[in-house]
């Protein structure tokens, strides 16, 4: 992105930077293994924290993270029975390795996690969390993950009221609470005893059943939920929408779908005791004088008409710049005039921004409602950023928040769809006037294959990018001084055994039908090899308008090849004559003349 693009840093300062605090209760039931194959709930929670920290140090190094245990016999700081296992700071290699030790040797580490004999006040724990966030994470988006199997933390009405008041304080401080309720050994976790009121205050809604993670298996779901927070939500650009007669409103745009790719952020020097960020420097030197060139001594040139046109930096900026960023409505058209093939790039989502121009939201809402009521689209002149190429866009209003899939929601607003210009529209090659039609049994068999391989419940949001995940694994191993992994599991590979089981029989039928059909076509075009009782099929020679015969007999072509004059003879033919020869033999007729000559020569060699 250009350095001079308009991004409101003050508004988006906290966007994309997260402060995550794990708050885990320590009790005898949390320390006991779930079964002989599943570790204890406390160990699972610490493993989850380790996996998250190892992931964030690569993908979001600016995030901060901490782990607070409560209900322990020992204490750190002034809060009784609360242990700050990991201070809320950016995760680094040493902190991550300390969490990793709980995964490898939890039995040795859990001795210091001895639970206390008294019940710990949850109100004191929540107050401790608010102190941590306000003192160390003021400019971050705050997430608190409460992991417990105690469904009755309030022992009397007074303690209940204090805990609920702490919940209001967390909400006022913009601290989002994400509880993970684990089932104790004796019964299922009972939300209605206390936590239904707690969650009503935190979330501000009556029905919270779908917002609560329950059961030990939900620890991994919690990790997936935190991982989803890593996608940046900053605006793509801010600009003014011009409505005419000096009427403008503020808008901001977002890209809802964007391919996430691995990007190099820094060079690292790896030969020292510790990795160090290397700052590369480059200089431009004159080839003639060997002296370093200054900025004002460098020019850019473009070739035009056999000569070079030289531009200075200021001149080049003037040529590239059309006008300041703007979105200018120039008219409206019926919605039916917009075709699916008009979309050149992914659509950009637009919404109002009232910070600079008061009333932008009201005007934007009026435009949105009018487009929907009239079944129209807006046509606008669009320049997204300084030095960006201008284009025409269609403004599409969405009627409301629409769940396209379980993992993707189409929001309420206006989408900008870039429209093609005359230079963008391309014509297709001419269509064969006599296309080969497939037999009906082949079409029916292919339909069965497609129905058998249909993924009815496919959700793209559930599949990670395999190359990106492998890239992160290698970076994580280097950052933590671990062995570089060699095994790679790609979950996007087709399940060949399942495919063979479902449609393997139909695939064999398709191959047989195609082979039979190919033989029939070969018979009709006269290129089938000699049958057992028949000699080679001899085709009649065509006569061009010029009267020159085309070598249409295979024997004649073979004889010319043996004599070594085939290349000379066929090069003298016209392209139309070559295509006739190839078409009669069922060979490809597309490409340049050299391609046609190669196709015919290769065919004769096989005779």
Curated annotation (Swiss-Prot):
Supply the enzyme class, top level: hydrolase
- InterPro entries recorded: Ku70, Ku70/Ku80_beta-barrel_dom, Ku70_bridge/pillars_dom_sf, KU70_core_dom, Ku_C, Ku_N, SAP_dom, SAP_dom_sf
The Enzyme Commission number assigned here is 3.6.4.12
Major place of residence:
nucleus
Q: Which Pfam families match?
A: Ku (PF02735), Ku_C (PF03730), Ku_N (PF03731), SAP (PF02037)
Q: Which GO BP terms sit in this record?
A: DNA recombination; double-strand break repair via nonhomologous end joining; replication fork processing; stalled replication fork localization to nuclear periphery; telomere maintenance
Catalysed reaction equations from the record: ATP + H2O = ADP + phosphate + H(+)
Q: Which cysteines are joined by disulfide bonds?
A: none
For this record, an example GO cellular component is: chromosome, subtelomeric region
Domain spans labelled SAP = 570-604
Subcellular location, in the record's words?
Nucleus; Chromosome, Telomere
Q: Which SMART domains would you find in this protein's record? A: Ku78, SAP
For this chain, one GO molecular function annotation is: ATP hydrolysis activity
- Establish whether keyword Plastid is in the entry: no
Which SUPFAM superfamilies would you find in this protein's record? SAP domain, SPOC domain-like, vWA-like
Q: Which UniProt keywords apply?
A: ATP-binding, Chromosome, DNA damage, DNA recombination, DNA repair, DNA-binding, Helicase, Hydrolase, Nucleotide-binding, Nucleus, Telomere
Q: Where do the Ku domain residues begin and end?
A: 241-452
* Top-rank taxon, per record: Eukaryota
Q: State the family named in the UniProt similarity comment for this chain.
A: Belongs to the ku70 family.
| Oligomer and partners | Heterodimer of pku70 and pku80.
This chain belongs to which protein, by name? Answer: ATP-dependent DNA helicase II subunit 1
